[in-house]
C-alpha cells in the first residue's frame, strides 16, 4: 500500500528520497511527504496529491542539506487524503518524525491514553500515536531503546521508520507483517518498502523479517529483535536489472508489460520442462503431493482469477478436487482441513496481507502449503517453504498483466506435474500441452503485432460508454472476469464478467444498444453454446465484440467486431484470450487521458487486511 524510503550517508538525502518515492508510485498513493535531519534540525514537507505537488512545495522552500531522511507516499486508511494526514508525523517537539506502512489496530486506545497524558494530535491517522509513544520513552534512553519500548505496545501489521534531530547520525526501521528491505552502500545505507526504490544504488540487500528492527548509520546496519537482542543477518546479492523499472519507449508501464508477456512465458517455462520420466521440473518436494485428497487455493483480485483457471486445470488434468477462496474470507469461513490438504497461496508481490494471514491460519491447522509468487524472497516465500517462482520480473503498472500470465503458466506446470505423478494423463497428452505452451509466446507476439493499431481505433468508439459486460464459459469464464476487472480498474467504466450461460438469469436485463458485450468464443466443447449466448445479447441490440478466431464463419457472422486469436488446443486458450482484453482496457483508458499506471484509489501491493 504505502511506500516508504530512507537514506543515511554523506550526500544530501533529498534527491535520493524524491527519486525513491517516484519509483514507488506504482504502489498507489494520495499524498506524500519527506523529513530530513540536518544542521538546522528536522525539516518536514508534505503535500496532498501526486509527487509533483510535493516537488513544487520543496522548490518553494530552502533546499534541505540534511544527510539523513525519510520519505512516504500514503494510501489513506485512517483519515481522508489531506495534507495534515500525510506522513511523516512528529511528536510535540517537532524534532522526531515517523512514517508507517500498515495499520495500527489499537490506535484508538493508545490515542486516548496519550491524550490523557497531554499529547495533542493534528491528524486523524493511526500513525500519529507512534511518535508520541516514542517521545514518552526517550528520557534517559537511546533512540533504538525508545522505539522498541513503543513498538511492543502496537498491535497490527506495520513497517515503521524513525528519525530524530536529537539523534542525527542514525535512523531506526521496524517490521511487523509489512515489507521492508534494507540496502547496503559504501558510506551510506538505505531502506524502502520495495526494491525498485534502491536498485539503482546497490545490489546488496537484506529483507527485514517480522519482529525485527534495524539501526542504520552511514557505515553500519545493526539488526535486533523486539527484545533488543542483536541478530546476525547476511545481505544477499540482488539479481535485478534497473532497466526493468524504466518505460523503454512505451507510453505507460502497463503497455510495456503487456508486450513483455512472450518473454515472461519463456522465462517461466525455462528449465522446467524435462523428459518422459519427469516431464515437469518444479523443484518441489514429492511429500507435498503424496496421498493428496483436496486442494484449496487462496488469492485476491487478479490472482484469484488466475486461481480459477488453476482450479479448472488441476481438476481436468489431475482429478484432484480443488476450491478457490478469497483470501479475505478464508479465515472467517474456514473449510475442513487436514494433513492431506494442500493450500496454495497466490500473490504477485508475496506481501498481500489477506493472503498471508490466511496462509498463516491454514498452517496452524497442519495443512501442506505451496506458494505461487513473483517474489520468492517475500513474506509469502518465507511462510510457505515450497513455492513456484513465476519469474515475471518487476511489474510497475498497478493493473496486473504479465504477472497474471505468469501465474497461469505456473498453474499449467503444476497441473501437468500432478497429472504425471497421479497417472491421470498419458505421457503423450502431457507432451502435447507442453509443446503448445512453448508455442504461445510466438502466438502472443503475433497478436501484439497485428492488433495494436486496430484496438487503438476501436477504443475511440467507447468514449461515452458507461457499462461493459464480458462473458465466457469454462476456463475462459475467469478470463471474462479478468477482462472486466482490467477495464474497470484503469478506465473507471463499470464492467462485469459473467458465465455466458448465466446471462439469461438476470444480467440480460441490463442490455441495450448502449451496453457492449465482449464474448470469449474459441473452438472447443463450449464454442457453440457461447455463440448462442452471444446471439441472445445481439437480439437485445447489444453491440457484440468477440474474442475469437477470424477464420471461423460462425464467429464472423455473430460478432460486430472480432479481436482475433489463433486456434489452439482449448485448454491453452486463456493465455491467448486475455491479451486482446488487456489491450482493449489499456487503449480505452489511455484515450480517456487517465493515469493508466496509477489508477485512483488502487495500490499495487495490498499489504493491509
From Swiss-Prot:
GO cellular component assignments: cytosol
Keywords per UniProt: Aminotransferase, Cytoplasm, Glutamine amidotransferase, Repeat, Transferase
Subcellular location: Cytoplasm
UniProt main location, coarse: cytoplasm
GO molecular function annotation: carbohydrate derivative binding; glutamine-fructose-6-phosphate transaminase (isomerizing) activity
Top-rank taxon, per record: Bacteria
Enzyme class of the recorded protein, top EC level: transferase
Active site: 2, 604
InterPro entries per the UniProt record, alphabetical: GATase_2_dom, GFAT, GFAT_N, GlmS/AgaS_SIS, GlmS/FrlB_SIS, Ntn_hydrolases_N, SIS_dom, SIS_dom_sf
Transmembrane regions: none
CDD domains from the UniProt entry: GFAT (cd00714), SIS_GlmS_GlmD_1 (cd05008), SIS_GlmS_GlmD_2 (cd05009)
Pfam families xref list: GATase_6, SIS
Domain Glutamine amidotransferase type-2 residues, every copy: 2-219
Domain (SIS): residue spans on this chain: 285-424, 458-599
EC number assigned by the record: 2.6.1.16
Catalytic reactions of this protein: D-fructose 6-phosphate + L-glutamine = D-glucosamine 6-phosphate + L-glutamate
GO biological process, one term: protein N-linked glycosylation
Subunit description: Homodimer.
Role this protein plays: Catalyzes the first step in hexosamine metabolism, converting fructose-6P into glucosamine-6P using glutamine as a nitrogen source.
Name used for this protein in its record: Glutamine--fructose-6-phosphate aminotransferase [isomerizing]
Gene: glmS
Amino acid at each position: 500500500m504505502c511506500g516508504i524510503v530512507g537514506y543515511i550517508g554523506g550526500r544530501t538525502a533529498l534527491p535520493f528520497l524524491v527519486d525513491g518515492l517516484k519509483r514507488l508510485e506504482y504502489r498507489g498513493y494520495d499524498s506524500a511527504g519527506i523529513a530530513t535531519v540536518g544542521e538546522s534540525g528536522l525539516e518536514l514537507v508534505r503535500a496532498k496529491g501526486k509527487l509533483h505537488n510535493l516537488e513544487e512545495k520543496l522548490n518553494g522552500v530552502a533546499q534541505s542539506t540534511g544527510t539523513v531522511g525519510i520519505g512516504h507516499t500514503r494510501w489513506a486508511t485512517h483519515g481522508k487524503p489531506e495534507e495534515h494526514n500525510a506522513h511523516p508525523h512528529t511528536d510535540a517537539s517537532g524534532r522526531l518524525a515517523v512514517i508507517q506502512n500498515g495499520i495500527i489496530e489499537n490506535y484508538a486506545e493508545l490515542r486516548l491514553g496519550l491524550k490523557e497524558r497531554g499529547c495533542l494530535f493534528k491528524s486523524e491517522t493511526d500513525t500519529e500515536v507512534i511518535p508520541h509513544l516514542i517521545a514518552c520513552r526517550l528520557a534517559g534512553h537511546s533512540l533504538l531503546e525508545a522505539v522498541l519500548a513503543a513498538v511492543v505496545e502496537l498491535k497490527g501489521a506495520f513497517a515503521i521508520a524513525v528519525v530524530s534531530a536529537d539523534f542525527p547520525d542514525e535512523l531506526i526501521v521496524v517490521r511487523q507483517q509489512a515489507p521492508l528491505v534494507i540496502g547496503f552502500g559504501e558510506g551510506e545505507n538505505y531502506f524502502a518498502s520495495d526494491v525498485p526504490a534502491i536498485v539503482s544504488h546497490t545490489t546488496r540487500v537484506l529483507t527485514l523479517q517480522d519482529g525485527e528492527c534495524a539501526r542504520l548509520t552511514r557505515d553500519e546496519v545493526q539488526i535486533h529483535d523486539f527484545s533488543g537482542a542483536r541478530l546476525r543477518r547476511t545481505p544477499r546479492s540482488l539479481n535485478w536489472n534497473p532497466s526493468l523499472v524504466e518505460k523503454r519507449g512505451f507510453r505507460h508501464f502497463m503497455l510495456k508489460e503487456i508486450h513483455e508477456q512472450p518473454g515472461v512465458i519463456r522465462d517461466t517455462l525455462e528449465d522446467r520442462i524435462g523428459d518422459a520420466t519427469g516431464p515437469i521440473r518444479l523443484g518441489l518436494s514429492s511429500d507435498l503431493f503424496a496421498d493428496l485428497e483436496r486442494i484449496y487455493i487462496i488469492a485476491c483480485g487478479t490472482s484469484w482469477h488466475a486461481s480459477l483457471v488453476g482450479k479448472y486445470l488441476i481438476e481436468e488434468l489431475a482429478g484432484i478436487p480443488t476450491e478457490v477462496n478469497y483470501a479475505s474470507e478464508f479465515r472467517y469461513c474456514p473449510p475442513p482441513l487436514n494433513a492431506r490438504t494442500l493450500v496454495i497461496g497466490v500473490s504477485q508481490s508475496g506481501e498481500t496481507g489477506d493472503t498471508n494471514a490466511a496462509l498463516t491460519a491454514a498452517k496452524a491447522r497442519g495443512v501442506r502449503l505451496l506458494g505461487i509468487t513473483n517474489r520468492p524472497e517475500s513474506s509469502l516465500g518465507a511462510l510457505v517453504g515450497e513455492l513456484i517462482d513465476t519469474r515475471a520480473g518487476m511489474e510497475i503498472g498497478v493493473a496486473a498483466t504479465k504477472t497474471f500470465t505468469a501465474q497461469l503458466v505456473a498453474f499449467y506446470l503444476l497441473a501437468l506435474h500432478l497429472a504425471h505423478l497421479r497417472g491421470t494423463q498419458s505421457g503423450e497428452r502431457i507432451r502435447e500441452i507442453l509443446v503448445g505452451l512453448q508455442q504461445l509466446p510466438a502466438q502472443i507476439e503475433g497478436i501484439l503485432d497485428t492488433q495494436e493499431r486496430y484496438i487503438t481505433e476501436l477504443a475511440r468508439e467507447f468514449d461515452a460508454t458507461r457499462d461493459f459486460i464480458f462473458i465466457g464459459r469454462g476456463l475462459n469464464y475467469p478470463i471474462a472476469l479478468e477482462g472486466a476487472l482490467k477495464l474497470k480498474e484503469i478506465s473507471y467504466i463499470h464492467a462485469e464478467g459473467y458465465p455466458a450461460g448465466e446471462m439469461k438469469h438476470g444480467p440480460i436485463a441490463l442490455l441495450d444498444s448502449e451496453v457492449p458485450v465482449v464474448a470469449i468464443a474459441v473452438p472447443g466443447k463450449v464454442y457453440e453454446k457461447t455463440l448462442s449466448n452471444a446471439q441472445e445479447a445481439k437480439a437485445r441490440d447489444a453491440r457484440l465484440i468477440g474474442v475469437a478466431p477470424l477464420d471461423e464463419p460462425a464467429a464472423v457472422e455473430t460478432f460486430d467486431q472480432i479481436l482475433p486469436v489463433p486456434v489452439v488446443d482449448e485448454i491453452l486458450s486463456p493465455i491467448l484470450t486475455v491479451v486482446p482484453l488487456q489491450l482493449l482496457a489499456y487503449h480505452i483508458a489511455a484515450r480517456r487521458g487517465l493515469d493508466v499506471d496509477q489508477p485512483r484509489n488502487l495500490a499495487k501491493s495490498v499489504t493491509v487486511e
